[in-house]
Amino acid sequence: MAAVRVVAPAPSVLLLVAAAVVLLHLARAIAGAADEAAALLAFKDASVAADPGGALAGWANSTTPGSPCAWAGVSCAAGRVRALDLSGMSLSGRLRLDALLALSALRRLDLRGNAFHGDLSRHGSPRRAAPCALVEVDISSNTFNGTLPRAFLASCGGLQTLNLSRNSLTGGGYPFPPSLRRLDMSRNQLSDAGLLNYSLTGCHGIQYLNLSANQFTGSLPGLAPCTEVSVLDLSWNLMSGVLPPRFVAMAPANLTYLSIAGNNFSMDISDYEFGGCANLTLLDWSYNRLRSTGLPRSLVDCRRLEALDMSGNKLLSGPIPTFLVELQALRRLSLAGNRFTGEISDKLSILCKTLVELDLSSNQLIGSLPASFGQCRFLQVLDLGNNQLSGDFVETVITNISSLRVLRLPFNNITGANPLPALASRCPLLEVIDLGSNEFDGEIMPDLCSSLPSLRKLLLPNNYINGTVPSSLSNCVNLESIDLSFNLLVGQIPPEILFLLKLVDLVLWANNLSGEIPDKFCFNSTALETLVISYNSFTGNIPESITRCVNLIWLSLAGNNLTGSIPSGFGNLQNLAILQLNKNSLSGKVPAELGSCSNLIWLDLNSNELTGTIPPQLAAQAGLITGAIVSGKQFAFLRNEAGNICPGAGVLFEFLDIRPDRLANFPAVHLCSSTRIYTGTTVYTFRNNGSMIFLDLSYNSLTGTIPASFGNMTYLEVLNLGHNELTGAIPDAFTGLKGIGALDLSHNHLTGVIPPGFGCLHFLADFDVSNNNLTGEIPTSGQLITFPASRYENNSGLCGIPLNPCVHNSGAGGLPQTSYGHRNFARQSVFLAVTLSVLILFSLLIIHYKLWKFHKNKTKEIQAGCSESLPGSSKSSWKLSGIGEPLSINMAIFENPLRKLTFSDLHQATNGFCAETLIGSGGFGEVYKAKLKDGNIVAVKKLMHFTGQGDREFTAEMETIGKIKHRNLVPLLGYCKIGDERLLVYEYMKNGSLDFVLHDKGEANMDLNWATRKKIAIGSARGLAFLHHSCVPHIIHRDMKSSNVLLDGNFDAYVSDFGMARLMNALDSHLTVSMLSGTPGYVPPEYCQDFRCTTKGDVYSYGVVLLELLTGKKPIDPTEFGDSNLVGWVKQMVEDRCSEIYDPTLMATTSSELELYQYLKIACRCLDDQPNRRPTMIQVMTMFKEFQVDSGSNFLDDFSLNSTNMEESSEKSV
């Protein structure tokens, strides 16, 4: 075969071929670049409606090679767009993904931190053959809504990372591509149960799953299918029920992070199995409703655990388990907000080898911190606040922890000299020192800052710190917060500290500071947000330099001796939310410029010497306020019920680290017996842009008319213009104050009528127009007729319920003035007499018809709003029949119930709820004596209107309380709802309250002998024991006191107001508020730390009542006890002056001082500072019964006990 000769191509041919290939690739690159540029521009045109920073201004239509790879946010590889990162560019518009999906090489898309919006469920796959190449997508922190993009997820089969967090997605959109490894859907509004179940059962390849901060409900499935998951975050949802028994034990071996914090899981975890947690490094089960004595022993199987958080469950109790020391890798331990008791074991100090953060705050721990904790050489954060720790361990133990950066010890009973010198010299890294509400004394060392250069927060409120505020604090250049309130400081504010560049909070209220306030604010820095220096003795003018503090949120200069005018420059402070200048001697006008403060929600100028008219511009911010700027501030509000002793609607305090029991001796409290204390955290938010919520201009000399523009402040809750010189009419525009709760216009010179539309102010709780010149009839709609007559008195032309009836002149002719002789006179007299008779008869018929029609309409209105208590029935209200029978309050407790009782009957029986029938008032409302037509007497309680309860919640609560019957509980006979009015009907107690009989002897005119007092003590204890141990569910009273112990004609004791504290919500929904449960003088020490109510708290309050019976003294009496109270006085006297404790009248009525001493011992046991050492009420009754053997009394003959319950043989008990 002949050989084939291969002829090599000429070099020129090869060059031509190579050139052709290059040209072909170049052409394709140019074409591809043009296509990708077109896709990006299409995306920009379709999705970017606003680009305020001009981030995409450089995107232009170009086909130049390298474009669009040089465009902002675009990254390329091999000339193709591989990544698009537009994060944080403030772009906005309705997102369209279609164009971007046309980029066939796009692997990573990052649009987080913009303002894109739209419904993601409408985003489909691109209309092309090539599949989606995306591997990583992050569109978090935008405003997307709707469900997940199902078609998008289906088309992107290679997607591995998907971040949809911080949007407003609601659910749907699964299944996910099997390639997915990381899924973050946190901080949305997801509630789809199917999505939750799929995420936890269809997660075969997912390694990271974050569903936190959504709205998922229901229970959890197991985790067995999630074989690869290592991070699972289900925190801050609405899930409930119990966890699967082996939820952790059967978890994947790869699981390292597990959080179910902030849900509503409720179960006993004492024996919970954690066996499968060998690789777990973080376990966060905080803020649920888990209960256990100690912690489950199986936790020691989690040997690699670095962070354990069981805080905020409130039901974990017993000693802190020492087996935790077996977790040898533990760096962060938080057991805060539970009920752990006892002392901190020194064995726990073994954890010091690794521990960096230890939080045991808000428990019931006692004793001291063991000395061995001084060896924690890695510990940086130590929080032992809100316990009952004592001793001087700060100086002896904590000062040895040189690594410490954050030290929080507020609300304990730690004593000793000021520990700051030792802390400063031995803990040089400290950034936060919080020693509030302890018993430290001494001065603040002048060289503090030279030893603590990193100090950011110095919090020493509510101690006994004396001396002056050292000017050397200005050397703490990193200082952000200074709180020295409620101490014994004197002298002036050193101007040097006002030059601190980072100072945000300066809080010095309730000291003895004096002099002029330095005019040196905000020259070097405008960081200051909180300036609260109220209730000192400052003089001079308000410094003009404060107007330079443009970031100021809370400014309080109240309760000083300031003079001069209010700076108009305050109107430039756009962040100012709370302005308190009340109780000074300020003069001049109210600056109209304050209306320019676009975030001002609280303005208190009461009790000054202001003159001029009220500027209508104050309402200019209505509809503009968002309110979020003041969120998170700790506050206390002392609400004044009434009276000139305490002017103004109330006092707002900055309340971080202040004990409520110390407020009891504060002048604003102990001078005002009707003042109640509310505490909480501000979370002012408005569904729409809101308005001011508190405005108090009372007790000034303001003149002119009331601005009608105030009616635009639809979120206004408190408006007090009383005690001024205002004239004119009440503006009809006030009917627009839909949220008003307290309106005081008293002691002015107002004329005209009360606007009829006031009957539509459904939240009105307190209304006072007394001492004006008003005329006309009080509107009968709404709740205006339910306020006492005192709120309308001294208005000579005002009439109607609850005042005297209005007299309508029907008009009648007069006698003729000219005489025409006897016959004409007689004839005319007869004619006039007949005419007058006819006119009078006709007028009477008209009046009768109008009254009949009025009462018919009123009956319909009342029928539409009343409900009856139906014990034993599931119905909480009933519909009217066609007969129109007046709706009744069912007297369920009587064996032979009274006939149907209507609201009209109660109104008539109390004479329109007039002052003459008022027999008592308290924190929950006013009580009236009502004598019914059949002779029966009942007590009618008109609840205060500050309530967040809806009809369903109120009715359910009343149905529960109405079924509780016991011989020593005041029975609820029925209730009535009329609009927002709530009336409760109780049995009438002839002898009133124990408080009245004991402490108002002049008016009560009765002395109680020991036998009667003993009878009252046992009866009230029996009633309280029934609530604690025999009611289902058990009831915590929350406000046990002598005024809630009522006495019948035989001086038998009845506990009243049980269940009421839970029913009442102190303020409206714009504040997250918890009313201080209890009354000053009766509040147990642990309530002053975390406001958590317990039966042992009731036991403490009962102990105070028992002391009142033994001593005859009031719980709080500054003239008797000074800064202390009855409990403190008795504990001082009981050691060696016991006989001086008893009421002298008792010594004359009892032959046995031993019995008095036995009852005193019971009282002291009830008043133990440690709740776990107090007896239960059953144990109190047992002790009483033991004493009875010697005393010969028969008060307890019908009382029996067993291990679990309390029963009585009386037929009245249930």
Swiss-Prot record:
Glycans are attached at residues 61, 145, 163, 197, 210, 254, 264, 279, 400, 413, 466, 512, 524, 561. Residues 1-29 form the signal peptide. It catalyses: L-seryl-[protein] + ATP = O-phospho-L-seryl-[protein] + ADP + H(+); L-threonyl-[protein] + ATP = O-phospho-L-threonyl-[protein] + ADP + H(+). The keyword Transcription does not apply. May be involved in brassenosteroid (BR) perception in roots. One of its GO terms (molecular function) is signaling receptor activity. Highly expressed in roots. Expressed at low levels in shoots. This is Brassinosteroid LRR receptor kinase BRL3. Belongs to the protein kinase superfamily. Ser/Thr protein kinase family. The chain crosses the membrane at residues 829-849. The active site is at residue 1039. A motif (Cys pair 1) lies at residues 69-76. Contains two pairs of conservatively spaced Cys (Cys pair 1 and 2) possibly involved in forming some heterodimers. Brassinolide binds at residue 678. A motif (Cys pair 2) lies at residues 799-806. GO terms for biological process: brassinosteroid mediated signaling pathway; hormone-mediated signaling pathway. Its EC number is 2.7.11.1. It is a single-pass type I membrane protein. Residues 913-1196 form the Protein kinase domain. LRR repeats lie at residues 103-127, 131-155, 156-177, 178-202, 204-228, 230-250, 252-276, 277-302, 303-325, 327-351, 353-375, 377-400, 401-427, 429-451, 452-476, 478-500, 502-525, 526-549, 550-572, 573-597, 599-621, 650-673, 689-712, 713-736, 738-760, 762-786. Keywords: ATP-binding, Brassinosteroid signaling pathway, Cell membrane, Glycoprotein, Kinase, Leucine-rich repeat, Membrane, Nucleotide-binding, Receptor, Repeat, Serine/threonine-protein kinase, Signal, Transferase, Transmembrane, Transmembrane helix. The lineage of its organism: Eukaryota, Viridiplantae, Streptophyta, Embryophyta, Tracheophyta.
